[in-house]
Design a protein with these regions (language model features):
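Bacterial N-terminal signal peptides that target proteins for export
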Residues: 2-14
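Bacterial N-terminal signal peptides
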Residues: 13-22
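Sec-dependent signal peptide cleavage junction
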Residues: 21-34, 959-967, 988
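Intrinsic-disorder/low-complexity accessory segments
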Residues: 33-172, 188, 196, 219-252, ...
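A short loop-to-beta-strand scaffold at the N-terminal edge of the catalytic core in hydrolase folds
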Residues: 195-201
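Hydrophobic, small-residue-rich alpha-helical packing segments that form membrane-like cores
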Residues: 276-285, 293-398
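C-terminal low-complexity, Ser/Thr- and acidic/Pro-rich disordered "stalk" regions positioned immediately N-terminal
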Residues: 945-964
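A cross-kingdom C-terminal cell-surface attachment/processing module
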Residues: 967-989
Length: 992
């Protein structure tokens, strides 16, 4: 579901308060104040918040008590304090009936347990997690003080698996399996906080797994030959993987659905189930495993499972990071997916509220990401989805016979009742996709899988209870049975994906799926080059400083592509194409490879999405522009043939050093490695200057240090260093102490990606950065002169209230909800060209010829005081808009074109830089980070920069060289304060 606006914030606030206040009811695992003298015997020690049940109990206090004297408690609260959440007048959760007292003191009774909430669903906004745990069920004779007790386990539903028990539960299933299967259970990597990301493989035998990996290696190089073997029957005894995973473990049933499925296939030879026609079928485990094997990953996010939240320890939603891969968990997950290249992937989620059904399964509505071979996906996607949905629905309470289904339009009993996302979003009456739920973003795991030839599904269960666990378990039974039955067709379909990619071939059948919201094929959705092709022949990423603005990013991309299964080559000689010479050592991505869809999705400029009423998430990926490196598509065939070697081993880049003298050393302000180097130097007490005037061999906005200080960073950073014979005009930077609030993107960017010294107390800061409206103490500090740098639509109200004459406009999106109320939000995004004012803040961008920026939020600065300096405005050129989704952006009256998007204001005791553009969104737009860092450095300038007398003034020019003594800094990702509780989703769509 889309992140909520007003309703979501209110619900989230209620949830947080409920989770933080001391528990008035439960008291955790309660103590009665004295050691119980007797034990209560019970028929079950496990109680559920979402299930009504009766528990037989008995005890003996050593004498015959009076019934009127018996008092009951659960935890440290009497039964009378346990009322379910139905408002002010909730019903008792615990009651006792059928109390019988024998003459010998034997007492028997029935404990009646009602729902903790107002039904059988512990919805995501309800603080059920605070109630789970062990409690003492105690009965006390108030006349004597004697008591009996039993420790009870109280969970949200019976099969719920907390993180602390996940490993032992899986190990127990493996230990007690009865089907003689090969079951491996291994770590595939570590999460940011150091937890194992575990994977279970279930196969007929180990040879199945080994043979598949060998077959996959062959299939990726000669798919036509493998396909011929399948068609002829020469290849018949082979098995293909079905990949099952979860990324949001706060959607609890999604974890337990996998565990219960694993338990079933490990311990039952056959599993009866109902199909979509209400017929009884048999799932024979060994027969199924003759055609498939299972890769089960209970969660990609163990920290979130441990702490009941959506994001990882950094607070990032990993299901918006599958391609950006700023987070370690995303890197682990995608590398494993690329290793196996399964035929299908089921990513299990929850929840959908205010929906027609309690189960929703992809495929998505349009618009579809242009690099997806959608015709191949759709050959089997709908059938595979229905195989899951039919069996899930018919073998749970969530079929057409349910009260919920009847309330939402079901007219017949015992029928499947679920939605296919693509179909649910389409209105036959209007012929439009009235409720789009798209896969335009590259960052969902199932979409990522599609780039690699895997049919990926997001599956949304409806509720947080045992019934949803059962539904998901049976859905997996239905889907895996379908894959086994259709193994050859599915595998041939994947082999066709490989063949098409290896030949860099394009099919007109794909383009039929790229339609408008009115369901009409959109002409030129895949923009074509001069040869009439969408995919280029090559991409070139230079590695020399003359051709590459950020060498560090060039080497980062090599590592990134290798991790994601993209084949990388390197030029062995200089090659000139269209008058441009690409130097030996440049990385080359030949698009004749099976990962060409993914490579192109990462490197191409992006798509302008026109006139859709809604998109689910960011549509712009464009690594060259958002990360900030030079990359050129080459459309001519064969120009690099015989001129490259494989470069599929990660290389460590080196600094690019040019010497013209030894008076001072200039560090080009061209990327994150430069920022990290400067912050490292400042932390060591080294004097660093911010160059205020351009000169020979350096630009305004670069950094300068004394020549003798370069050894302080000589082995760490891939930066461009120029030793010069003069001392550039510069001012000394005071080490920043940046106040950053708890925004996950900001904290990750400033601590992990840029190595700033950050403080949590604004009184200790010498500058503030924020992407959100500041707290009152921060506002007060800024009003008293503390420099402030703000970026994003979220700080504009504060800027308006603080800067005289400042105003802004937001283009709001108003969207009718499919199931709930109208939504109003501001998710428009754009990759666009800008014009810069003369400022230290933008000087390094202007010097590099980097006139492209990105924004998320759909806003402009409409007014500003005369004293302000305009830093950036959107270009007035007709082609300024490069990619994104912003309806009306290219209208004649100019929603964005020519408008101001950043100012600097220093007047009246205020020192504020305001960007209405985003800067740290998803920690992906790192090329824009230096707008913030330049603003910060510019506000902390002191005396003129000077150097010591050592060194020579005479120029000593030398040819530019790369030095083996300067190594690349590792790409940084690790812990920040978590987002906290589970994100609360809107009342409209699925929580992707």
């Amino acid at each position: 579901m889309r992140k909520s606006k007003v309703l979501t914030k209110a619900l989230a606030a209620i949830l947080c308060i409920a989770m933080l206040i001391p528990m008035a009811v439960t008291g955790g695992a309660a103590e009665t104040g004295s050691e119980p003298q007797a034990t209560i015997s019970v028929s079950t020690k496990r109680l559920s918040m979402t299930d009504q049940r009766e528990v037989a109990l008995s005890f003996n206090l050593g004498y015959k008590p009076e019934a009127a004297n018996l008092e009951w408690s659960f935890g440290d609260q009497p039964f009378s304090q346990w009322l379910n959440w139905e408002g002010d007048d909730g019903e008792p959760v615990f009651t006792v009936k059928d109390l019988t007292i024998a003459d010998n003191g034997d007492v028997t009774a029935t404990l009646c347990v009602d729902y903790l909430f107002d039904g059988d669903d512990a919805a995501y906004w309800r603080p059920w997690y605070s109630y789970r745990g062990e409690y003492a069920l105690t009965v006390t004779d108030k006349s004597t003080g004697r008591s009996a007790s039993q420790t009870m386990r109280y969970e949200v539903y019976d099969s719920y698996t907390p993180y602390s028990e996940l490993d032992s539960k899986i190990q127990e299933i493996i230990r007690t399996q009865t089907n003689g299967l090969y079951i491996s259970y291994e770590s595939t990597g570590l999460s940011t906080d150091g937890k194992d990301v575990m994977e279970v493989i279930v196969a007929r035998d180990k040879a199945v797994v080994d043979n598949y990996l060998a077959l996959l290696k062959r299939a990726q190089t000669e798919p036509e030959a493998v396909a011929a073997d399948v068609r002829s029957g020469r290849l018949s005894d082979y098995q293909v993987p079905v990949y099952i995973t979860n990324i949001h473990p706060n959607e609890c049933p999604a974890v337990d659905q996998q565990i219960e499925f694993l338990k079933a296939v490990a311990t039952q030879e056959t599993i009866p189930y109902l199909n979509g026609d209400n017929e009884t079928c048999t799932y024979n485990v060994k027969d199924v495993l003759n055609d498939v094997f299972f890769i089960i990953r209970p969660t990609e996010n163990p920290y979130a499972l441990e702490h009941y939240q959506r994001g990882n320890v950094e607070g990032f939603d990993l299901n918006r990071d599958s391609t950006y891969q700023t987070q370690i968990e995303s890197q682990v997950a995608t590398a494993d997916l690329v290793k196996w290249k399964p035929v299908t992937l089921m990513e299990l989620h929850g929840f959908i509220y205010y929906a027609r059904t309690q189960l929703q399964i992809e495929p998505c509505t349009p618009p579809h990401e242009p690099n997806l071979e959608y015709d191949l996906f759709m050959n089997y996607a709908l059938e595979g989805a229905r195989a899951f949905g039919d069996v899930a629905s018919m073998n749970s309470i969530y079929n057409s016979s349910s009260e919920y289904a009847k309330e939402n339009g079901a007219t017949e009993d015992n029928q499947p009742w679920y939605d296919i996302t693509m179909e649910a979003g389409y209105d036959p009456a209007t012929g439009r996709y009235e409720y789009p739920s798209d896969d335009m973003s590259t960052n969902y795991t199932p979409t990522y899988a599609l780039f690699h030839g895997t049919i990926g599904y997001t599956v949304e269960c409806g509720e947080n209870n045992e019934a949803s666990v059962t539904m998901g378990k049976y859905g997996l039974i239905g889907h895996t049975a379908y894959v086994a039955e259709n193994k050859n067709g599915l595998y041939l379909n994947q082999l066709e994906f490989f063949r098409r990619a290896l030949n860099n071939e394009e099919s007109p059948e794909t383009e039929k799926w790229f339609v408008t919201q009115d369901n009409q094929v959109e002409e030129n959705f895949r923009e074509k080059d001069e040869y009439g092709k969408f995919y280029p022949e090559y991409y070139v990423i230079p590695t020399d400083a003359a051709s590459q603005r950020d060498i560090a990013d060039a080497y980062f991309m090599q590592e990134y592509f290798i991790r994601n299964g993209v084949q990388v080559e390197k030029l062995t000689q200089d090659v000139t194409v269209n008058g441009v010479t690409y130097k030996a050592g440049a990385f080359v991505i030949d698009m004749h490879q099976i990962s060409r869809s993914f490579a192109n999705a990462v490197l191409y400029k992006g798509k302008i999405v026109k006139n859709w009423t809604g998109l689910f998430s960011e549509s712009v990926t464009n690594f060259p522009e958002l990360r900030g490196f030079d990359c050129t598509p080459i459309t001519q065939p064969g120009v690099f043939e015989g001129k490259t070697v494989d470069a599929n081993t990660v290389e460590r880049g080196t600094a690019w050093v040019t010497t013209y003298g030894t008076k001072a050393t200039v560090i080009s302000n061209n990327g994150l490695d430069a920022v990290n180097a400067v912050n490292d130097l400042l932390a060591k007490g080294v004097t660093v200057g911010f160059i205020t005037e351009a000169g020979d061999h350096y630009s305004k906005g670069d950094f300068v240090i004394d020549y003798k200080d370069v050894a302080q960073i000589s082995d760490q950073y891939v930066i461009e260093i120029t030793h010069v014979a003069d001392v550039p005009q510069a001012r000394v930077i005071t080490e920043p102490k940046v106040y950053v609030d708890d925004d996950s993107f900001d904290r990750f960017a400033f601590t992990r990606q840029m190595n700033f010294k950050t403080v949590a107390d604004v009184s200790q800061a010498n500058v503030v950065f924020s992407s959100n409206e500041p707290e009152e103490d921060v506002k007060a500090a800024v009003a008293n002169g503390l420099p402030f740098v703000g970026a994003s639509v979220n700080i504009l109200e504060y800027a308006k209230a603080t800067i005289p004459g400042f105003d802004f406009k937001i283009q709001w999106i108003i969207e009718e909800g499919m199931y709930g109320p109208e939504e109003v939000y501001n998710d428009y995004e754009a990759l666009f060209n800008v014009e810069y004012g003369d400022s230290l803040i933008t000087a390094s961008y202007a010097a590099a010829g980097d006139f492209t920026t990105y924004t998320k939020g759909g806003s402009i600065i409409s007014a500003y005081p005369q004293e302000a300096t305009v830093l950036m405005r959107a270009s007035s050129q007709d082609d300024f808009y490069k990619a994104g989704w912003w309806n009306g952006i290219d209208d004649p009256d100019g929603v964005l074109k020519g408008q101001v998007v950043a100012i600097d204001y220093q007047s009246g005791g205020l020192d504020m830089t305001v960007f209405c553009t985003s800067i740290t969104n998803k920690a992906h737009q790192t090329d824009d980070y230096r707008l913030a860092t330049n603003a910060i450095y510019s506000k902390l300038l002191g005396a003129d920069f000077t150097v010591s007398d050592a060194g020579q003034d005479e120029p000593v020019p030398s040819s530019p060289r790369t030095g083996d003594d300067m190594n690349v800094v590792a790409w940084i990702a690790a812990a920040v304060l978590s987002m906290g509780m589970a994100a609360v989703f809107t009342t409209r769509k699925k929580a992707r």
